[in-house]
UniProtKB/Swiss-Prot annotation:
GO terms for cellular component: nucleus. Keywords: Coiled coil, DNA-binding, Nucleus, Repeat. This is Putative DNA-binding protein At1g48610. Residues 27-44, 57-72 have a biased composition (Polar residues). May bind DNA. Residues 103-113 have a biased composition (Low complexity). Residues 1-130 are annotated as: Disordered. InterPro entries: AT_hook_DNA-bd_motif. One of its GO terms (molecular function) is DNA binding. It comes from Arabidopsis thaliana.
């Protein structure tokens, strides 16, 4: 076999760089153990900052499943029917907030009639008496404890009764009535005297008319 002649390096040839690995003579570059050339390492230069984490297959699968399970954002379409909860679940879940007035009034009626639960707090004495005694045997309300009201005390006077003051107004009314009757009689007498004078004048005129 013919040997290939090695061409000696020219005088103007480029001197091998210090960064490029080579053998002891510096003529032949050494092969990289990792199989990556120098150009590849130069292109994969490390940038600034912390390198991003490598995403594993399990995390990607979990993210995909989470996206699939979550509710789609935005307004739902019109033709898609919304999921209606079953009656058993809706009845089991208690609504939050204050109950409606209709339910409150119904509860009050049941407690007032005695069919529902017992009232809260200490019951009144009248209610206790009404509950113990049947409705047919109730004759009068239960007697209350304590001092009687002022109205009942005033109805039973303790001191000597005062003289009746109704006699004085009656006497004043009688005197006023007498004065009015006397004035009326006086006016009637005056009117009768005037009428008498008018009658006598008319008689005189008639006599004069007959004499002519």
């Amino acid at each position: 076999m013919a040997k290939t002649a090695l061409t000696p390096p020219a005088s103007g040839s480029e001197v091998p760089r210090s960064g490029t690995p080579g053998d002891a003579s510096g003529n032949k570059p050494q092969t990289d153990a990792t199989g990556v050339s120098a150009t590849d390492t130069a292109s994969q230069k490390r940038g600034r900052g912390r390198p991003p984490k490598a995403k594993s297959d399990s995390s990607q699968i979990g993210a995909v499943s989470a996206k699939a399970s979550t509710k789609p954002s935005g307004r739902p379409k019109r033709n898609v029917a919304q999921a209606v909860p079953s009656t058993s679940v809706a009845a089991a879940v208690k609504k939050r907030g204050r109950a409606k007035r209709s339910t409150v009034t119904a509860a009050v009626v049941t407690t007032a009639t005695g069919e529902g639960s017992r009232k809260r707090g200490r019951p009144k004495k009248d209610d206790v008496a009404a509950a113990t005694v049947p409705a047919e045997t109730v004759v009068a309300p239960a007697k209350r404890r304590g001092r009687k009201p002022t109205v009942e005390v005033a109805a039973q006077p303790v001191r000597r009764t005062r003289k009746s003051t109704s006699v004085a107004p009656v006497a004043a009314n009688v005197g006023d009535l007498k004065k009015r009757t006397a004035l009326l009689q006086k006016k009637v007498k005056e009117a009768a005297a005037k009428l008498k004078q008018a009658v006598t004048a008319i008689d005189e005129v008639q006599k004069l008319a007959d004499g002519m």
